[in-house]
């Protein structure tokens, strides 16, 4: 195992402050050549997106794309790398666009360890869905713009571009009629931000997330980051890119350790670790909480994440899945995740009725739902929601909208719409 899980203090405030200085250009890594994956119906793709997505910032940054172009001369577009998988017959109308969290890459959805159990992409293609699991900007084999420009808002703008390309047949030559955004952790933050602004997906599934968070555990994780250039694996990343320090991931903060295979812990540490940017850290607090830019709240603080004009503006069917052992987003002593009904009650007040908000809790699971022994149950729960809302053929949306309002929004009461796993 490459890293031993322990906590070490490195000053999280310094991480946030670092983003302000990270407008320094650095040589960008071009994405590696496209290769066919050994998995049936899967292939890796490099998708161009305009550098103008970097202009989308909480603090307006006009001309940010000009800086990105200067860093990567002759290539005006950024590149998003991802793995597109289709069902065996190749006939599908609904695609899932999957977004990983910080310090991960698309491998979170494409696990190679016991893939029949832990591989989300395989599970969903077997269920009839297509899936495009990407490396977000700054991670994996996607472009590495200047760190301060790779923020939550820029990631959301990039996802908006990809949704349009999936609908128009510009990714893999397949025109998809329906798109489901699926997020994990920071990928869920990106999903909420993108949808609150564009509402261009047909449904969203978010995992390991919530509308309030425990700041102490989050600061503990932030304190384990170090400059990526100190890690031999990431020494070519630009200044301002971060990764886990020598002590690695705090396993007790990411897993229910009573329900995880030790071999999975080793696999995750050696195969799935990746980078994040100081810009992503710095944009987290002010974008989702009433916190001034650059300020880090105290460790004992429980903060509400969404500003009213954000999640309240989501108008597509929304699903949130957390584990009972979620330490970051389930409140003090995980009180918000004692049951699916309690998580529904806690979270629905942050959404309008148009979101048809649903929530589910996975027992004996922590932050890394896809990597726990009961990952198949989490996958089944997400698939059941997708089946009810859309289905692989995308035909169920009108019916779902007509029946879901009974338990959505602030009106938490029994309604006619149900789904099996809950």
Show where each model-derived region lies.
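Secretory targeting and sorting signals
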Residues: 1-30
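N-terminal cap/lid segment of alpha/beta-hydrolase-fold proteins
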Residues: 33-91
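Short, surface-exposed "cap/lid" segments of acyl-processing enzymes
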Residues: 89-132
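Alpha/beta-hydrolase active-site loop
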Residues: 149-172
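Alpha/beta-hydrolase fold nucleophile elbow
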Residues: 171-185
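Alpha/beta-hydrolase
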Residues: 224-338
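Conserved loop-alpha-helix segment in the C-terminal half of the alpha/beta-hydrolase fold
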Residues: 324-362
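Catalytic histidine-centered segment of alpha/beta-hydrolase-like enzymes
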Residues: 362-374
């Amino acid at each position: 195992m490459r890293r031993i899980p322990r906590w070490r203090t490195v000053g999280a405030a310094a991480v946030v402050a670092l983003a302000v200085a990270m407008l320094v250009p650095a040589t960008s890594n071009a994405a590696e050549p496209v290769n066919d994956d050994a998995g049936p119906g899967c292939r890796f793709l490099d998708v161009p997106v305009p550098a103008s997505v970097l202009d989308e910032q909480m603090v307006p940054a006009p001309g940010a794309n000009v800086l990105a172009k200067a860093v990567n001369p002759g290539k005006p577009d950024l590149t998003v790398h991802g793995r597109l998988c289709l069902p065996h017959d190749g006939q599908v109308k609904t695609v899932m666009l999957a977004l990983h969290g910080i310090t991960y890459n698309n491998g979170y959805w494409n696990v190679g360890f016991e893939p029949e159990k832990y591989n989300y992409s395989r599970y969903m293609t077997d269920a009839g869905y297509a899936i495009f699991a990407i490396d977000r900007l700054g991670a994996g084999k996607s472009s590495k713009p200047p760190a301060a420009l790779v923020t939550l808002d820029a990631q959301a703008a990039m996802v908006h571009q990809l949704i349009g390309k999936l609908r128009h047949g510009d990714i893999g030559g397949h025109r998809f009629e329906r798109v489901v955004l699926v997020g994990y952790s920071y990928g869920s933050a990106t999903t909420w931000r993108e949808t609150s602004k564009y509402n261009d997906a047909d449904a969203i599934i978010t995992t390991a997330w919530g509308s309030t968070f425990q700041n102490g555990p989050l600061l503990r994780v932030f304190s384990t980051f170090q400059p990526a250039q100190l890690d031999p694996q990431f020494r070519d990343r630009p200044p301002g890119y971060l990764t886990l320090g020598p002590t690695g991931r705090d396993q007790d903060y990411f897993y229910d350790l009573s329900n995880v295979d030790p071999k999975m812990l080793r696999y995750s540490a050696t195969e799935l670790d990746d980078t994040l940017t100081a810009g992503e850290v710095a944009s987290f607090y002010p974008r989702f909480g009433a916190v001034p830019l650059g300020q880090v709240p105290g460790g004992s603080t429980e903060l509400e994440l969404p500003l009213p004009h954000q999640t309240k503006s989501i108008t597509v069917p929304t699903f949130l899945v957390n584990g009972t052992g979620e330490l970051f987003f389930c409140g003090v002593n995980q009180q918000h995740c004692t049951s699916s009904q309690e998580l529904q009650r806690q979270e629905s007040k942050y959404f309008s009725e148009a979101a048809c908000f649903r929530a589910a809790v996975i027992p004996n699971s922590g932050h890394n739902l896809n990597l726990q022994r009961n990952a198949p149950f989490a996958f089944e729960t997400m698939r059941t929601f997708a089946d009810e809302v859309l289905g692989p053929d995308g035909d169920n949306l009108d019916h779902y909208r007509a029946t879901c309002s009974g338990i959505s929004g602030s009106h938490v009461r029994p309604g006619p719409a149900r789904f099996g796993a809950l």
